[in-house]
Amino acid sequence: MTSVVVVGTQWGDEGKGKITDFLSADAEVIARYQGGDNAGHTIVIDNKKFKLHLIPSGIFFKEKISVIGNGVVVNPKSLVKELAYLHGEGVTTDNLRISDRAHVILPYHIKLDQLQEDAKGDNKIGTTIKGIGPAYMDKAARVGIRIADLLDREVFAERLKINLAEKNRLFEKMYDSTPLEFDDIFEEYYEYGQQIKQYVTDTSVILNDALDAGKRVLFEGAQGVMLDIDQGTYPFVTSSNPVAGGVTIGSGVGPSKINKVVGVCKAYTSRVGDGPFPTELFDEVGDRIREIGKEYGTTTGRPRRVGWFDSVVMRHSRRVSGITNLSLNSIDVLSGLDTVKICVAYDLDGKRIDYYPASLEQLKRCKPIYEELPGWSEDITACRSLDGLPENARNYVRRVGELVGVRISTFSVGPGREQTNILESVWSNI
């Protein structure tokens, strides 16, 4: 029994897709356990970029099983489109498995998402308007439609009529918006269900059988710990649990079967949307990092907010997600800076604190306390070992590991697979 969970330790966009793709080489099953098509990940293979939103990164290994678990909310339209995109690029998808217990995102979820966000005005959360939150709301309210329901014509029709009637009352009475028509949704989405039917199964059985057989299973999280609905910067969070604990709920695999948790982070910090960001940069350094790091959302295309590396955030993520190994990405983006900074603590009303407050009001008053390190001017994109890095870059990597309190297993100096350097195999000693 061998399993590794990959989680983002910041606000998403840390490079999880790349690391998952990298670790997939030694895995036999790769599974997603939460989120939806609001999460975008980019994988570079032979200098070609592939952008995925729902399908696990392991799909590019045709001999491995890729799983969309029960904790994922699935937009069938987006999924069919993504499958067509992969087929058009010559990628086979016969190795995909989709949980019959996963909940379905329908047009009324997306419409409600937009209406709710518009109604918030200046207090908007910054949702991607993909219907994720409303779909999870229906799931919690026990009125959601699952993949198993989508495949049954009579059941889907019955539940869609009930849900649509309720949502239309909401649209008309609360939001003064036009209702949606049953006939505009039913046939289209039932057909999507038929197109993905071949992939649908009880994925909990597949995952547990694989683990019991001693196979290597890799769990791929979406978003990041700081967007976790319980442990993140609430309410500026997603509607699911990206933390490693989300695996047990979102995949149907018990906690006793999780061996290691790899936390993925960038050598700086970024975030899309609104919410607290203590180390955010508003100067030329921030603009430089954004442009060199190509910090624009995979899903939204929006410019990401960027800032210095925050070890307070990272220690919080380590604690609540049980991180055992760290993967540090995008060190090359910091090349050329005379000085690089790491936030080591916060100043809250004149008091030094080393924890991440739950209160948004306190977070607004938190000022980062920085440790400054000398930068490096060398191009490090061809470095293939820690010793190959310039001394200042090497010291930066080591200091990150010390402040977070987790050993660094891999570090990356560029987006390519070959630019990921192994310091310690996460698959060993399990």
Swiss-Prot record:
It catalyses: IMP + L-aspartate + GTP = N(6)-(1,2-dicarboxyethyl)-AMP + GDP + phosphate + 2 H(+). Substrate binds at T298, T299, T300, G301, R302, P303, R304. Keywords: Cytoplasm, GTP-binding, Ligase, Magnesium, Metal-binding, Nucleotide-binding, Purine biosynthesis. Its main location: cytoplasm. It is an enzyme of class 6 (ligase). PANTHER family: ADENYLOSUCCINATE SYNTHETASE (PTHR11846:SF0). Plays an important role in the de novo pathway of purine nucleotide biosynthesis. Catalyzes the first committed step in the biosynthesis of AMP from IMP. Belongs to the adenylosuccinate synthetase family. This is Adenylosuccinate synthetase. It comes from Streptococcus agalactiae serotype Ia (strain ATCC 27591 / A909 / CDC SS700). The gene is purA.
